Amino acid sequence: MIKDPFERLGLDREVLTVSQLNGRARVLLEDVFRSVWVEGEISNLARPASGHMYFTLKDSGAQVRCALFRQNATRVRQALRDGLAVRVRGKVSLFEGRGDYQLILDTVEPAGDGALRLAFEALKEKLGAEGLFSAERKKPLPAHPQRIGIITSPTGAVIRDIISVFGRRAPQVELNLIPTAVQGREAIAQIVRAIRLADSLGFDALILARGGGSLEDLWCFNEEAVARAVAACVTPIVSAVGHETDVSISDFVADVRAPTPSAAAELLAPDNSGLRQRLDGLQRRLLLRMQNRLTHDRLRLESLTRRLRHPGERLRQRAQRLDDLDMRLRRAFMLNLNQRRERLARLDARLAAQHPGRNLKLLNQRLDSLAERLPRAMREVLKDRRQRFQAQLQTLQVVSPLATLARGYSILLDEQGQAIRSAEQTRNGQRLTARLNEGELLVRVEDNHLTPVTLSLLD
């Protein structure tokens, strides 16, 4: 044994740097504790990409850090995990960079299941057999909560993260903190009292939250008293304990488990952008339907225009009129839609100061009604315009000179193609053209007195 380690290391008068002190302390520890066996329970196990393992070995009264390097880790047969009771062998050393006292291990043997893990599995099996985890017991979360109770520590990042999520997504929701300790033996009774108090205050939903930590740090959420308080809660409750990889008994009993406290807030924070997205979707659908219908009618009109050669100018005017109505209808539709979007934006701006949950259903119903009425109104307008167009087309066909020829009349034309309206425009022997409904005749004037003209067909 070393009777005077300071004398041996030359520390009686020498002034050392921190690095020198840590280096000599490491040498001293490794010289005295070259190989020791220690039994305890693993916690805070870490496996970096290097293949080394780092964890804390603890018992009920103390803990020590351990390092198991890759060449020795490959020889460990037992899969290591938090809560596992093990017996380890190694040398006592010092990590000089931080001045941390630690064990450098060469052997790890199982010493039976960890007490905490055994207690966890036993309680999980017991409560599961009672049906406390069944899906039939789970209560649905409210779609648009107005008041939410948050059961967590009043300090730390958890409450700030939850407030931040609600401030960003749903600032109109009222948040109420029910403070409690979230670690240690005294936290168990506090959490139970906080759950019962929150359940009696008429909140729309509750969040039971805590940040990450070791199995021991989170253990109060694995206690039977806390689990039964969660199960007895009438208000829908979300359990958000630890990180995504952490699982607690309260997660199984709660109505919904969230991987993190921020995720729990997102589950309960209604997204006000959803209504705007729905309106934009309806706008796109209505515009597409309107464009398809107008394109179909325009193509049909163009087809009719090509088939009706007379009177072409009137048809072109009607087509232009229809295009004008089309553009006016589009402008009116866009004006109406923009007005409704502006009104929705104003309502959205008031959400932060008011509670819009009561009016949200009414606004959705009104929006659905408008979405159903607008295509029907458009079809009625197009139908009326089409009927008026057909009526005017029939009127044009009645007064057309071609209709007169079809009833048996003819038109006399002179050599220059001018219409003959009086006998005075002709002379005896003059050759004329008689245009009929179908074909033409070449005729000659026999007598051009003011009495009816006598015509004869030319040989």
Curated annotation (Swiss-Prot):
InterPro entries: Exonuc_VII_L, Exonuc_VII_lsu_C, OB-fold_nuc-bd_dom. Its main location: cytoplasm. One of its GO terms (biological process) is DNA catabolic process. It is found in: Cytoplasm. One of its GO terms (cellular component) is exodeoxyribonuclease VII complex. HAMAP family: Exonuc_7_L (MF_00378). Heterooligomer composed of large and small subunits. This is Exodeoxyribonuclease 7 large subunit. The lineage of its organism: Bacteria, Pseudomonadati, Pseudomonadota, Gammaproteobacteria, Pseudomonadales.
